[in-house]
Amino acid sequence: MKQITIASRESKLALWQTNFVKNRIQLELNIPCEISTMKTQGDIILDQPLNKIGGKALFMKELEVAMLSNKADIAVHSLKDVPYQLPQGFCLAGFMPREDPRDAFVSNKYNSIDDLPKGAVVGTSSLRRKAQLLHYRDDLEIRDLRGNIQTRLSKLDNGDYDAIILASAGLIRLELVERITQFIPVEISLPAVGQGIVVIEALERDNDLLEKIQKLNCRESSRVATAERAFNQELKGGCHVAIGAYAELDNNQITLMAMVASSDGKKILKRKMIGDDPTKLGKLLAQEMIALGAYKILES
């Protein structure tokens, strides 16, 4: 097969993820690859929260345009940045094994969320993290924090924040695990849908390529991600609402935990459901939570 061109964002984390996929394709499928890097609107507009400027799709559009114009064959993403609905003609072709899905508490002064003094300033731009943090500690001050991992860490080191919240997976992949002060338990902060999973996006029409990429697919990641994304799709959730979902696979049984919260964290609804059909499980849990008032909570 001809060389595969992989579209990637320019950040260190994006390139780590893309090189991980590139190496697997070359080693396991014996197909040569090259990486084409590009800036996305999500990388350029850093002075506003994502939920105010168009959401997670801002990290993908330029990569998808490259695929449509035959400048790239596939794109690599963090699954948590992929909206529940892809543009027509695109599909998720392969799911990589999941890294630690938990949120990370990072601080130079305090050992855990519990150690933070009243009024401590915590940096995150995620409504999901903000809502759950405020639900657990309503005496904290949450301030927006955008930029790549290195930018966020430097803002912490410069004293702009007492602590920041990041995805553990990104820090682990960039060999910055020593910066993690506390892996936040999922009981306190339920992860984002797909957090910790790297995914390959491709064009549906490219059957030959899809067949080959499928050989790299991690069944466990695919099944838990499908359950989490089905839940999110049924709720029609994006980055403008506080939604979390995390699934675990044991034999063939999937345990799906989900959370919706008001942006101030005062109202929160958590539920858990077990099943063996990931799509059905995600939809059923979402419907149960809708019946319990999920939409009212998200709107408040």
Curated annotation (Swiss-Prot):
Tetrapolymerization of the monopyrrole PBG into the hydroxymethylbilane pre-uroporphyrinogen in several discrete steps. Monomer. Belongs to the HMBS family. Pathway: Porphyrin-containing compound metabolism; protoporphyrin-IX biosynthesis; coproporphyrinogen-III from 5-aminolevulinate: step 2/4. Binds 1 dipyrromethane group covalently. Its EC number is 2.5.1.61. Keywords: Porphyrin biosynthesis, Transferase. It holds the Pfam family Porphobil_deam. This is Porphobilinogen deaminase. GO terms for cellular component: cytoplasm. The modification S-(dipyrrolylmethanemethyl)cysteine is found at residue 239. It comes from Francisella tularensis subsp. tularensis (strain SCHU S4 / Schu 4). GO terms for biological process: protoporphyrinogen IX biosynthetic process. GO terms for molecular function: hydroxymethylbilane synthase activity. Its cofactor is dipyrromethane. InterPro entries: HemC, Porphobilin_deaminase_cofac_BS, Porphobilin_deaminase_N, Porphobilinogen_deaminase_C, Porphobilinogen_deaminase_C_sf. It catalyses: 4 porphobilinogen + H2O = hydroxymethylbilane + 4 NH4(+). SUPFAM superfamilies: Periplasmic binding protein-like II (SSF53850), Porphobilinogen deaminase (hydroxymethylbilane synthase), C-terminal domain (SSF54782). Coiled coil: none annotated. It is an enzyme of class 2 (transferase). Transmembrane segments: none annotated. The porphobilinogen subunits are added to the dipyrromethane group.
